[in-house]
Amino acid sequence: MFKVFGFGAKEEIPELSQEEKTKAILKQAHDFEQALRAMDYVLDDNADEGLALLDESDAKEASDQTINALARGVIEFLEATLGFEAEEMKKASATLAKAEALSLKSRERAQKIGLKSSSLYPPGTVYAVTYTESCLLHALLMIFSESMMEAAKAILKLRKSYYMLQEILETIKAANKAKKLKITSGSEDKESTPATFITGGDAFNSVDIPYELTPEEQKDKDLLQFAEQIHSMRTKRLSGAHIGNSPAINRLRGELGLQAMEDLPEEEITDHKVLSDDIDLSQATIDEFVHSGVNLCFGILQVVISLLPPAIGAVLSVVGFRGSREEGLRLVWKATKQRNVHGCIGLLALMFYYDGPFQFTDDDFDIPAAVKDSSNSEDSEDEEMDGPTLLHPGKILEDALLQSRALFPNSALWLLNEARMLSGKGRLEEAVALMDSIDVSKIRMRQVKSLMIFDRAITLIHLHQYDRAAEDILSLLDISDWSHAFYTYFAGCCYLENWRMCEMGLMKSDKKDEYQKKAEELIFTSVNLLGKKTFKSKNLPLDRFILRKVEQFKAKKEELGVENPLDGIATSPVHEISYFYNGYNRMSEEHLELTKKMLTEYRNPAIEALDSDQELIKDLLVSLTLRRLGHIQEGCDILDEKVLPKFFSIQNGKVKYIKKTEDPWAYPTALYERALFTWKLEGMDGLPESKEWLLRAQGYADDYELSTRVGMKIKAAIDRVDHSL
């Protein structure tokens, strides 16, 4: 409709008249709105519709190829990181690389022609944001590839993102400060006054054009119609009316779970309404994109850097990276206040941080955060979250998730996150019931389908429902290309525990022999799948864990000379898996008691051999079970007397480690858990000692099996202690 000469052309760009610039600014806002709508379709489990929208936009003359490329990159990034499959990651990387290149060209073009599409920021700022977003997502994919060459390139990309984000963030802060001064002084800047159209006596203000229109433009009906169309697109997106769903307000709940869904009022509201008072209806599309994009990217970047192990963190510090977990979380929270894809990705990141399978904020380390005085800070804002709220967002996080559930009713991704939140609160049965409420076969996004089944299996083992957990996990062999070795081993461990429960009389089943046969077959053949059907060129950390465990089981069978291979397995391996996925913090008292019984009362030749390494694993898990049951001192005594002395001692005031390789994850983990015991026993007075234990955990080894998972948890705990000391 509005062809702007020079856009999309390779030749030198001529200067544009104000009328041409106005048309270009509106076209840019339109294309960004179209891209935001496309990405929202994906978040509602309708990727085909979203990609079709982008195809339609690409086919139009003078469309904004940059935001379209980024939108495709974001869609493909979500698909790649949800499933970690090689082809998906390769495709996303190529698209994001294209978005990077286009962003630099678009930024240069906007600067040359002076295209001021924001009342706050200089020309080209929005493309600086698309560049940093493309760079950051591309770098994350490079890191996930575990190629040394790709990782080196990723550091360079992260560095570029980091510095440009800092620059843009400073521009935002300066612009906000200037805006406040103008409001205080009562002055008005014509350059930042929204454009006003006058037709037939009525006036319409367009916030997307950040300057006064000429008299001719004010009466241009085509220009007015286009501005009104963009306003309508934005209004529909902010209220959730843009992707074909009924009003979200009718689905908005105040509580989690299926019961709250059943308790929704029967009378329906027919008008679409925004779900949050935080949404600014008067904000221009480009300004919204800049704010939310910078907050999301810089926030996630800082949180990730803050969680990295000291060795890597030290290297990054040398090249200028600094990560503040608290500041990063605060920025991500700001991003979630925007009703766009940045807000949604920010919420997914927060859900993973607070309530994900690894739960970086350990429930047992419930230290109250100190409230630091920020009243004198120039950059402080009234709406910023304080330390305690960042640590335990509680209902704020719950309400943010429930808004997304209302806005995207067709997406299993948000339902999965609600189930994870229920699980994090110990409401395991409700979590499973919620996941059962959806027909998994109808989930369009294959990666989300895989995650749903995997999470349900994990939750089921916390409930000791091993039969169904095994069925779920084995079904992933036909759906996911992640790690067939781990899926097979996991299922075998489930059948092993069922067989043991039958042996102990805790479970009556005519399938006892079947459980035995399946456990033996799946556990011992799982290693044959290593290196196959996995997204990386080398085995995953969990794959290496499986290989070591199975080799241990085989060696013990040979050593003891037992006929049944299962008699060569001492501590039940399913309890290790449960620990890796935070099961001990989520089990009820009933399920913790059953865990304790299975760990302490089952007998077989391998257990009776009292192997030192197997006893260490058993005693570590028993100590955690006792702590969660409230027997804190008893659990601590087991850790001090039976676990720590096997690899750790203090001689003449100096820490001495005995380097062991039998179960590498267990040793730093035991030191980490010892810090939590000190906190539980001594409270705030014990924080200095807790920090000592955490530093010992961090110093145990530079690299070990599952070091990333354990190391991030330790680093997050150290940051929490430092904040409270």
UniProtKB/Swiss-Prot annotation:
Where on the tree of life does the source sit, at the highest rank?
Eukaryota
Q: Where in the cell is it found?
A: Cytoplasm; Nucleus
Q: Which residues form the signal peptide?
A: none
* One of the record's GO cellular component terms: cytosol
**Pfam families registered for this protein in UniProt:** Iml2-TPR_39 (PF10300)
Q: Does the keyword DNA damage apply?
A: no
Alphabetical UniProt keywords: Cytoplasm, Nucleus, Phosphoprotein
Has keyword Cytoplasm?
yes
Q: Where are the Phosphothreonine modifications?
A: T196
Q: Which family does it belong to?
A: Belongs to the IML2 family.
| Function of the protein | May be involved in mitochondrial DNA stability.
Annotated protein name in UniProt: IML2-like protein SCY_3392
**What is the species of this protein?**
Saccharomyces cerevisiae (strain YJM789)
Q: What does UniProt list as this organism's lineage?
A: Eukaryota, Fungi, Dikarya, Ascomycota, Saccharomycotina
